[in-house]
Structures are given as structure tokens and as C-alpha cells.
Amino acid sequence: MKSHEYIVICGLNRSKVGRYIAIVASFLSFISIFLALTALEWLKNYHINSHIPASVFSLISAGGIYMGLYAWFDKNLWQNSYLGKFLCVPNLEGRWHVDGHTRSEGGNTWEGELKIVQTWDKVRIHLKTKASHSDSVTASIIYDKGIGYQLLYNYRNQPKTGEEHLTSHVGFAEFRFDADLKSAEGHYFNGQGRATYGTMTITRIEHA
């Protein structure tokens, strides 16, 4: 399963982020081209004939700079803690230890590891236990100023070979994170193959 887009509810509008990056790209493009042309004029004073290839101007065009800035923002820049607070998007990327409690079928406890791979545009949530593994299909993050961040996602679960008592199924999970983003509590519901439900507590092991 590959990473997929996710929705941010009550965070900074994503289209505004694109516009802000476009404004910065336009400004940097203007400065870059101005400096390049100034350098050419300066070289002429020393009777040095030079020219800048069209390919260079294409790289320092607003479009070229925008692509570079957006790639940097998507992979790394958005994870800055101060910028993250402004964007209202938490950095959940990393490995999390899972303590689960099935509340149906007689009830039982289980453990697993949740791995979240996250960029500004996409996310992948993978849960691995001794009996099965699941991957997110859709996801959304909700920001509530009075409560904090919530993560909601749908997933598809696949039992490991030899687990005959388990069947493939889809489900839904929801987590509410502490203010320090080091732990969260939540619950899950399964259906279309396995009608079970329960609770989960996750604790961050490490950042990616």
C-alpha cells in the first residue's frame, strides 16, 4: 500500500499555503534574474562578453523555484515545530507502540507497532501485530484548539499466513493525541469480514 492524500480539518487552508509559496517563489525569481542581469552588465565593464543560457533562466523562473520550494516544504519544512503550530498540522511521523484491548468476542489484550509515514501532502499508517497487519486507505486530521489533534482513518487488514481464525476486513480507527504528541488514546471498529471493536493506546517510540 502506498501513501495517500489526507484531509486537514480546521487547519490552515492548503490552497493558501500554495499561494504563499508562489509569492515567495516570484520574489526569489525576481531577485535571481535581477542579480544575473546585473552580473552580465558588470562583466561588460571589463570587456568580458558573456551570456546566460536560456536553461539557467528557466531554472530561476518563478515556476522552477516554486517546484523546488514546494518539494522542500512537502518533505521537510512543514515539520518545523513553530511552522507546524501556525499550520495547525501535527508531525505524527515515526514509530508508535500500541497497547490494544478488544472489547468484543470475550475481550483480549494485544500489542503491536504503528508506523506513520507523513509528508505535507500524503500519509501512510501501517499497523503490525503478531497476527496481522493493516494499511490506511483514507485519513484526516482534525485540529480543535480546546482539545488538540485527532487522527481518523480507514484501513484494510490482512491476516498473516497461518492465522486461519482471522479474515481480511476493513475498519475505522480514531485517536486523540496529548498536547506533546507523545501518546494518544483511541478506539477502532471492524466490519466487512470481522465485526469487532476495541480501544488502543499508542506511545511514540521514535521520530522517523
UniProtKB/Swiss-Prot annotation:
The chain crosses the membrane at residues 20-40, 52-72. It comes from the Bacteria. Changing residue 152 to E: Complete loss of protection against all phage tested in E.coli. Changing residue 155 to F: Beta barrel has decreased ability to bind c-di-UMP, no change in protection against phage in E.coli. Pfam families: Cap15_CD_rec (PF18153). Cell toxicity relies on the transmembrane domain; its replacement by a SUMO domain prevents cell death in cells also expressing DncV from V.cholerae. The C-terminus (residues 78-208) forms a minimal, eight-stranded beta barrel. Trp-96 stacks against Arg-204 and forms a hydrogen bond with Leu-92 to close the barrel. A set of conserved residues in the 'top' of the barrel (Thr-129; Tyr-153; Tyr-155; Asn-157; Tyr-188 and Met-200) surround a probable cyclic dinucleotide-binding site; when mutated these residues decrease or abolish nucleotide binding and impact protection against phage in vivo. This is CD-NTase-associated protein 15. It comes from Yersinia aleksiciae. The gene is cap15.
